[in-house]
Structures are given as C-alpha cells and as structure tokens.
Amino acid sequence: MAGNKLLVYLLRRDLRATDNPILHHLATSDHGFTHLLPIYILPPHQIETSGFVVEGQKSPYPLAKSQVGRFWRCGPLRAKFQAECIWDVKKNFENIGSGMLIRIGKFDDVLKHLIKSLNEDHQSIDTVWMTEEPSKEELDDQTAVASVCSKEGIGFKLWHDEKYFIDDRDNGLKDPQDTPDVFTTYRKTQEPLRERPRPPLPRPQAGSLPSFPSWIPPQQAPFRIPDDYDEFERLLLEPVKAPIISDPPQFPEGAKSAHPFKGGETPAWDRLYHLIKSGAMTTYQETRNGLLGTEYSTKLSAFLAMGTITARSIHAELVKFEDGSEESYSRGFGFGKGENEGTRAVRFELLWRDYMRLCTFKFRTRLFKIDGFKGASGNYTKKWLTDREEDAEPDQNPTPAQVKDMIDRWIRGTTGMGLVDASQRELQLTGYTSNRARQNVASYLTKSLGIDWRLGAEYYEQSLIDYDTHSNWGNWQYQASCGNDPRSRSFNQVKQAFDYDQDGRFTRTWVNEVKSIDRLEHVFQICTCPKQELEKHGLSDNIMVTNPLKRIDFSVTKPRGNRRPYRWRKQGDRGRGGRGGRGGGTGNTSGNGDNRHNEPSPPNGGNRHNDFSPANGGSYMQGQPISGGYQQMAWRGNSHGLPSGRGYNSRQYMLDYSQQQQQPQHQLQHYYAHQQHQHPHPRQQQQQFYHQIPPHI
C-alpha cells in the first residue's frame, strides 16, 4: 500500500449507510484517501465476548457485569438484536463497494494491534475517524484512541453525532451547561419542531467510497471472528444465555412479542415505511400508551439507539407524508393533510431523546450516581435500600439478604402486583415492554419498595432491546425523583392497571396465574382475591397471595351521601391533591465506586466538535374515548399518577355502583370509559404532549 492513504473509520452507534456524515463526506468530497477500512469493535466491558475465545485459551478481560447489581451489561436478547444490526450494516457497506471488519477488544488495544500488524507489512494508517458520544465510557474510548494516534503520528478526528432530531449546532445552546434543567423550558426554545431538523444525507452511490483494503490483519488472539452470521450470533449469545434467576418464567401460550423485529438499517427503514403507510403514525398519539401488540407505538427506539436510522430521517419521511409528496404513502390515513396530532407527538418524543442526551453532556457521570442530577446541589439526602452488605446502613430494615430476595421476585415477576409482574415477565422473555409499563415498574421498585434505582437501571440495561444510555438512566432518575423531574411523584399500580389495561388482557397474557380470575381488582392484585376462588384455581399457597411484596390499597368504596356514585379509589384518599411520592425505607450511601461512575479525563487530541425507550419514559395521561382509538391527553400527575393533582375527585373516575353489580366485567370497563367521555376534565382543552415525562417511541 505504498503511496496509499488509509482511513480507519471506527463505528459505534452509527450502524448505517444512509444519513451517515462520514460516508457522505467521503463520497462527495476531494479528501485524498485511497482506502477506507470501517471497523466495528465489540467492547468487552459493555458486551460479554468470552464466547469468541479460541478453545483452550482465556479471555484477558473481566466479565461484562454491571457495577452495582452485577447484571450482564448486555443480555441475550439485546445481544441478538445488536448482532443483527452489525451484520446488516456490514452487508450494506458491501453493497456500496466497501466492507466492514468486526473486532473484539478495547478500542486502543484494537488500534495498537492494527498499527503494529500494518507496520510489519510496511503499511500504515494515515487517519482515524469516529463519531463522538457523550457518555463516560465512550469518552474514555475516544480519549484512548486519540492518545494512540498522537503517539503514533496518526491523524485523528471526532465527527459530530448527527443521528438526533435537532442538530446541536442549531439548538441555540452555546455550551452544554446551558441546557435547562426542565424539559418544558428546553422544548419552548425549539418550537415549532417541524421546522428545525436538518435534511438527512443520501446513501452513497456504489463505487463512490475509497477502496476497501485487500489485505487485513487478523483478529488478535485469543479471539476469533467467524465468517457467517449464525456462528457469530451463537458465540455472542453463548456466555449470557443462562437465566440470571432460578425458576424463570416460561413463555405463556398465546403470548406474542410486541417487538418481533430484527435489528439493522434495512429492518429500520422497513418499519418506518410500514408505520407511515398503515396510518400508525397518524394515530400514534391515541395509541402510544398501549400494552399489547406491535402497532401501539413505533418500536423505532431500538433502531435509534443503535444508530441504524436517524431521527431526522424519520422526520423527513413524515414531512413527505404530511405534504403529500411521496405517492407510496398515499394510502396512509392523513396523507397530504399536514402535521397531525400523531406526527407531532412523534417529533415531540424525538426531542425528548435529544434532551436526555444533552443532560448527559451537562451532568456527565452524575447520570450513574445514586444521588443523580439533583445531587449536584449537595442537598440530596435520600437513603435507598440495598442488597449489598458493604453499602447498607447498619440498621437497614429489611436486611440486605431480604432486599436481595425482593429484587429477585421483582425480576421474576412474582411481586403480586399484576401490572408490574406482567411487564417484568414480558421484558425477560421478549426484551421489550411498553412505555406505560416501564413507568409503573420503575415507580414500584423505587417508590413502593424504596430500592436503589440503579439496580433497576442496570437490569433494564441488560434486558431491553432498545436500551439507550441517556434515556434509560435519565428515565430511572426521573422516576426515582433524583433526576430532572421538577416534582416528586409516584404511581398507584392498581389504578394504572384499571386505566391502561382496562380489560385485563395484558396482565392475563403474561401472568398465567391470573388468567382465569374474573374480577379485575383481583387480576391486578391477586392477594385481594377471595379464599374460595384462590382454592378453586390452586393459588392459595402462591407467594404472590401469601406474601405480596407491597400491598396497595385500592378498592370500590361507598360514598358518604347520595350525591355521588360509587367509584374506584385508593383507600384513605380524601380527594385532595397529592404532595408527591416518597420512596420508603432507609438504605445505602452513595457507593459511587469507579468505572463509568467517575468523571473521565478530557480527550487529548483530535478535532472534537462541541456540540437523555423505557426507556421507561412517557407521560402521566388519562384517556378520553374517541371513535377509532383511545385518545391520550398529557397531564402532570400527583402522588398517585393522576391528572390535575386533585386526588380522585374528578367525575371521570366514578362508577355507578348499581351498574357495576349488574354488568359483566368487560361491560363495566366500557362504562368506565364512557363516564370519562361524559365528564372530560376541563384541562383536556389544553394542548397535548407538553407535560410528558421522558418517553421511548
């Protein structure tokens, strides 16, 4: 390769050919590079790679386990999705005349080995490019690569990350520290959202990129990279496929994954086209709090997290649909009629993703600290329950061993809280659970049980197919009230189930034990079921009945006079405004540890541009039935996740007791919805979306 100029492109969460600034630059400018070597590195601290070790040898890296709970950093379902993303972009690069290597190791180790191998063959690297990322571990990787390049006299450049909705260079923030601490404040500075994104960049034409090198150094020992996808996936999943708990849930008969999609750039675009053509984007605002099926939300969050599609590409296709300029979208409901509530809601949530990332830029390693963003003020005093003896308060009650059992049951989905258990089983078996369910699961762990929120964030990191560092950790802080939520709040999971699992289908689908239980209040909290029915279904000795982790008082109660009908309400609630939820129990100290929980050193070298699916985000919403869907409205919640902060006084929650006694359960739920329609809350006249908590889409 004498006389040639080799550019090494290190990919991370930019696994796409379309709207890729680096590829676009190489395809359209006079850059002088003769060869391009794209490399995707599997980082052993973030994903377990011991399956690739040659037989008889040992991995030089420790297990890829989380710091607090010792969960896998990447579980089998996300590992499979990630493998599909890697292999798909590899094929796409090949289709435009390039290619992509897959390597294992720390970024600087891989680069050093590549330089050494090339030098031994009298070859060299001219420049290394990569796209910037703001998280601590990613910053460390950037710093390490920049250091190697500086020592070896190799050029290095960090490219601006352009996979987000509004480009950082256009959001008006001169410095990340200027990011408002409240999302609404930031949102107001960016509207109207439809006018803000930059246009996406086209896919490079075949043959427009520098040549792929003909000679490539092998993978450094002791690892090997197979040439076919099936073997690659098998080796990646082998170390992490065993269940992390005893007696894990089995896949229920008749249940289906809400996220059956393969990973990759190609499936991402297929999904986007389907959403627009089917009209699902138009109805998104009405359906986004759904629990079952593939169509209630976009399911684009996993693709966005891996960078297989960009937010501005999604926006650009929505504009074509709204303007009526793309004929292939003409059968989609709302075609050519401008922005609608659904497409506006999608943009709103894409902006949330931008904001969560900006918060990472601003707060850095506070994203992972137990006192969260609010700890920056120095006034955070909350103590959390922990299962770690070394971190627990001397008088912690329950004990660390008891907390460990509570966490195991939370993971297994045997807490006794139907909505929570259904979500946890769905997550463990499919790698996905809905936005609304994530909020309730997080609130239950942090507010009802008072357990260290980082354990929840780490478990979601392991389990979620659509895991995104900024959204996941930021959302868990939000639910734990140590993030950028201006108010402390908590959910009543029984009421939430009545609101969003109105016929009990979701809970019954994933929790086999309650499949044949008739009354919804017993489905949603099995310990309230009468003894005779428990005996009938063989549930008398079930741990969810005999020892629920946290019983939540919620029942049908009789009013004091004849002026009001019977209604669903939390026992003890007098209809006054909530003051915000509080997590119970004493607990551990900060336990900051090391690794990504500590501040990184700044990058030394290179051109750095200065520029947070559940995760468990979403909104406190109460629905109003409309023709063709369940119209969701955005509200600020009080301590029970209710609109308006006024307890249960709103007539939209009331039930006629006589009709309850006379009607079957499914008719009762229809009547419940009808009451909401007849008595809409006055604040439903306000604009939508504006008070949501962090979402995934």
Curated annotation (Swiss-Prot):
Q: What cofactor does this one take?
A: FAD; (6R)-5,10-methylene-5,6,7,8-tetrahydrofolate
Q: Where is the composition biased (Basic residues)?
A: 560-569
Its GO biological process annotations read: photoreactive repair
Q: Where is the composition biased (Low complexity)?
A: 659-675, 683-697
Q: Does the keyword Flavoprotein apply?
A: yes
The record's section on Pfam families has: DNA_photolyase, FAD_binding_7
Q: Where is this region: Disordered?
A: 170-215, 554-697
| PROSITE patterns membership | PHR_CRY_ALPHA_BETA (PS51645)
GO molecular function terms attached to this record: damaged DNA binding; deoxyribodipyrimidine photo-lyase activity; FAD binding
Give the top-rank taxon of the lineage listed in the UniProt record for this protein.
Eukaryota
Q: The Photolyase/cryptochrome alpha/beta domain covers which part of the protein? A: 5-164
> What are the UniProt keywords, alphabetically?
Chromophore, FAD, Flavoprotein
Q: How is the cofactor bound?
A: Binds 1 FAD per subunit. Binds 1 5,10-methenyltetrahydrofolate (MTHF) per subunit.
Q: Where is the composition biased (Gly residues)?
A: 578-590
Basic and acidic residues composition bias: which ranges? Answer: 188-198
- Say what the protein does: May have a photoreceptor function.
Extract the PANTHER family matched here: CRYPTOCHROME (PTHR11455), CRYPTOCHROME DASH (PTHR11455:SF22)
User: Family assignment?
Assistant: Belongs to the DNA photolyase class-1 family.
Recorded protein name is: Putative cryptochrome DASH
Q: Which organism is it from?
A: Gibberella zeae (strain ATCC MYA-4620 / CBS 123657 / FGSC 9075 / NRRL 31084 / PH-1)
Organism lineage: Eukaryota, Fungi, Dikarya, Ascomycota, Pezizomycotina
